[in-house]
């Protein structure tokens, strides 16, 4: 497992973003805040990212918005993004195929 440092606006010095690279897929934790004023990466939440989404947490809309948002930010197809766990929770484990841990780190740095 590879741990990458994170330097977001809400970064906490006691945590580092934990990114796992296994079998061609990168996975990390995302904390989703639905019904926000805009879609954005806010910063770090424990060992993952905190993402605000405008979509409500109803009828899978927040999950679909998270798929689109991450695919857009990482420039991958929607099929490359998968919620590995936490589909009905605000804290999710996301798996993305076709990206490197370094690319995920770049995403965090430029949020």
Show which residues each predicted segment covers.
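Contiguous, often N-terminal, cationic amphipathic patches that form binding interfaces
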Residues: 2-67, 73-78, 82-111
């Amino acid at each position: 497992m590879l741990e990458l440092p994170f330097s977001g606006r809400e970064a906490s010095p006691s945590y580092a973003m934990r990114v796992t690279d296994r079998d061609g897929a990168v996975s990390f934790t995302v904390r989703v805040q639905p019904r926000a004023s805009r879609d954005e990466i806010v910063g770090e939440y424990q060992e993952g990212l905190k993402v605000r989404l405008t979509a409500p947490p109803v009828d899978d809309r927040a999950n679909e918005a998270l798929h689109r948002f991450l695919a857009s930010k990482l420039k991958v197809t929607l099929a490359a993004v998968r919620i590995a766990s936490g589909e009905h929770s605000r804290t999710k484990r996301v798996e993305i195929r076709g990206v490197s841990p370094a690319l995920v780190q770049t995403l965090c740095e430029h949020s």
